[in-house]
Regions:
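Short helix-capping and inter-helix turn/linker motifs at the boundaries of alpha-helical repeat units
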Residues: 13, 111-112, 178-182
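Short alpha-helical transmembrane interface motifs in multi-pass membrane proteins
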Residues: 80-81, 170-173
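Mobile beta-alpha loop/short-helix "lid" or hinge segments that flank ligand
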Residues: 62, 66-67, 159-164, 178-181
């Protein structure tokens, strides 16, 4: 097991640090569905005790991201497509309303922020750096929420969207050369809609953009049948 590890943040507790690193590696598919996890191995990689890792496991199990089986171990939960659909509904509903607010009134300084974010996305696209593009994608959407005074709602959406985001990451990893240009185009058009105060165009774009998560699902299920819940693959082990 090899985790992508970043430094502990100032004022961040050991427990929060362990949770953040594990969550990030689940999202980036370094910890894949069905994988067995070891408290001790992760603790060793993070140079911390097992207790905060165990606490992170319990928290993630409560969120249906990990499965803890007594006497057997802890495993990464498979991607539940029903949960992906629920997250897509949540995002489409909330982002459409926030886009309406953004098209009605949006501060100039925040326009500049979105344009800077698009420039970073353009660089990631050119470098074919899909993890960085994914990160900037989230910053772009989160910045729109923040500019409309809805930052906490975006945080709640992100907390409820791990399965949705894992599938998005798989799409980028599997077909980034097609996915990234299309997503980048959507973002540019969203910014144009905000500038032109075109609510209808903005809401149509949101629906298309968020719903794109299912565009390559059949191919992904063929390549990685053990990663998804449903059908004959419904058993974890």
């Amino acid at each position: 097991m090899k985790l992508e590890i970043s430094a502990k943040r100032s004022q961040e507790s050991i427990r929060a640090y362990a949770l953040r690193i594990i969550h990030k590696n689940l999202l980036k598919m370094n910890l894949v569905p069905g994988m067995a996890l070891s408290e001790q191995e992760i603790a060793n990689e993070l140079h911390i005790s097992r207790t905060p890792v165990r606490e992170a496991f319990i928290r993630l199990a409560h969120e249906n991201i990990l499965v803890i089986l007594p006497q057997r171990g802890t495993y990464v939960e498979k991607i539940a497509l029903e949960q992906v659909a629920e997250s897509m509904f949540l995002r489409t509903t909330m982002e459409s309303e926030v886009m309406k607010l953004a098209c009605h009134s949006f501060p100039t300084r925040n326009i500049d922020q979105l344009e800077a974010c698009l420039e970073l996305q353009r660089i990631s696209l050119k470098q074919k750096d899909y993890p960085r593009f994914f990160e900037q994608d989230g910053i772009f959407h989160g910045s729109i929420f923040a500019a409309c005074g809805k930052h906490r709602i975006w945080q709640m959406i992100e907390q409820a969207s791990l399965n949705y985001n894992r599938l998005r990451m798989m799409n980028l990893a599997n077909d980034g050369e097609n996915e990234m240009p299309m997503l980048f185009k959507h973002h540019k058009e969203m910014l144009t809609a905000i500038k032109q105060r075109d609510i209808e165009a903005g809401r149509i774009l949101i629906k298309e953009h968020v719903g794109k998560v299912f565009s390559n699902l059949d191919d992904l299920k063929l390549q990685y049948p053990s990663y998804f819940k449903g059908g004959t693959e419904d058993t974890l082990i």
